[in-house]
């Protein structure tokens, strides 16, 4: 029995989950928010009950220290030596990390070098890794990369039609994201279908505030919608998804904004929020659409239409399709979005049952008619359990 921590460190937050492995039993989970700001919030789950404290937590090291103290205080662990390993989500692994990796000084340095490809995420992920390595120097720490699952994409899928030297010199290519989630639900889909994953062609739809679609053929990612950064692909909560790059200099000229300011608009003020003018939260938009708000209806139409395009494209890419999987906050909980995405796909052999779809929230289920050649599933994602599994494997803890 091993105790493994799954960690997701943000610039001012630290999300943690403690597993007993290999049973995959969750012993506790929690969240530290507003690190480095006044009135930081520390939340931990003890016997299913949330305990929250407000205090000042200066940095990630202090957050880790407090987390360990609280786990001891509540009897979740007797001593820090009870912990056998930690696994850390890292957003960008470039084309260096095809799998998860045991963190060494060299690996840490490589993650730092990749910060320019994910300036919003990798520096924060690295802060978490450094804090845990300092506090717990005698156990293995493993980095689990969002991009690793997508390193199996062929060159024709990941390359942009730019001068080839930009790829050689600067690493400009499609990297994708949400790889841990796409991998988890694709593998789970194969289990539910009771078929070897090597025989399956699956489209996984990770739809949350950030969203990406992946083509998974024979258990490997062969294409995905996010690109060089998580700004590309389908319409998202506040992100634009794909657009004509000439719009950027055009907007700079028209608005007087710098390139970075325009990128901020594309990242934070666009997507569902930009089109609807209401919210980036799909629940708010669905409610307004039901009330007949035209912009809310339009936002939903655009959202579904972009996902449609990827499903059609990826089914063509794989020369057929066995299953479509919905996951993440919206994919698991919005029957409205699922219905809009599935509408009109009968020509591809997708026959979904509106009764099975209606009201389904956060549960694992098939939502297709029995005779449907293409199966449609809702599978709640569990990135933390994937992090714990890889920590066992790459930390040599099995």
UniProtKB/Swiss-Prot annotation:
Bound cofactor: record note: Mg(2+). Can also accept Mn(2+).
Active site positions: 146
Main subcellular location of this protein, as a coarse class: cytoplasm
Gene Ontology CC annotations of this record: cytoplasm
Stored PROSITE patterns: ACETATE_KINASE_1 (PS01075), ACETATE_KINASE_2 (PS01076)
Binding residues for ATP: 15, 206-210, 281-283, 329-333
One example of a Gene Ontology biological process annotation: acetate metabolic process
A GO MF label: ATP binding
First and last residue of the signal peptide: none
Record bears the keyword Repeat: no
Pfam families named among the record's database cross-references: Acetate_kinase
Family in the record: Belongs to the acetokinase family.
PANTHER family in UniProt: ACETATE KINASE (PTHR21060), ACETATE KINASE-RELATED (PTHR21060:SF15)
Quaternary structure and interacting proteins, as annotated: Homodimer.
Protein name: Acetate kinase
Organism lineage string: Bacteria, Bacillati, Bacillota, Bacilli, Bacillales
Gene: ackA
